[in-house]
C-alpha cells in the first residue's frame, strides 16, 4: 500500500530496475483526526495518489486499503472506503480492490464493500509480537 507520492516514485523506479510490475493499493487514513503515527492518505487526497500510481511505469493501480482506527466503531470507520474506491476507479476502472478488515472487524469491512480481508488471527490464533 502507498500513501505518499515519494513512495510511488521509489516503487516505480525499483520495479522498472527489476523489470517487474507491482500492484499498489492507495492506503486510506480513516483516523479522524488524522493520527501521525499511522499511515494513510486522507480520503480527499486518494485520487491524487491514484493518479500518481497510474502514471508510473511498471506500477499497477489495484484499489484502496485501510485499517480501522483503534477503538473506533468499524462500521462507521469503513464508511468512507466505498467513495474512495469510486475515486480510484475514476482513474482506472479496473482498480476494484477494497482491502479492509481484519479478524475482529471483517463483517463491518465487508458491509462497506471490502473485497479482500486480512484474517490471520482467526485462522492462526493470537501470536506474540515479533520483537527484533
Feature annotation, model-predicted:
Residues 1-104, 110-112, 121-126:
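Conserved alpha/beta-domain cores
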Residues 116, 129-132:
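Active-site loop ensemble at the mouth of alpha/beta enzyme cores that anchors a bound cofactor
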Amino acid at each position: 500500500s502507498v500513501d505518499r507520492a515519494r513512495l510511488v516514485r521509489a516503487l516505480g523506479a525499483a520495479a522498472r530496475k527489476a523489470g517487474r510490475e507491482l500492484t499498489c493499493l492507495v492506503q486510506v487514513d480513516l483516523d479522524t483526526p488524522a493520527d501521525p503515527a499511522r499511515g494513510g492518505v486522507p480520503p480527499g487526497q486518494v485520487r491524487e495518489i491514484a493518479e500518481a500510481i497510474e502514471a508510473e511505469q511498471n506500477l499497477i493501480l489495484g484499489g484502496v486499503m485501510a485499517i480501522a482506527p483503534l477503538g473506533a466503531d468499524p462500521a462507521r470507520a469503513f464508511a468512507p472506503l466505498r467513495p474512495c474506491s469510486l475515486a480510484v476507479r475514476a482513474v482506472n476502472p479496473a482498480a476494484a480492490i477494497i482491502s479492509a478488515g481484519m479478524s475482529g472487524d471483517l463483517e463491518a469491512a465487508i458491509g462497506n464493500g471490502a473485497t479482500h480481508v486480512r484474517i490471520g488471527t482467526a485462522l492462526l490464533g493470537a501470536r506474540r509480537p515479533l520483537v527484533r
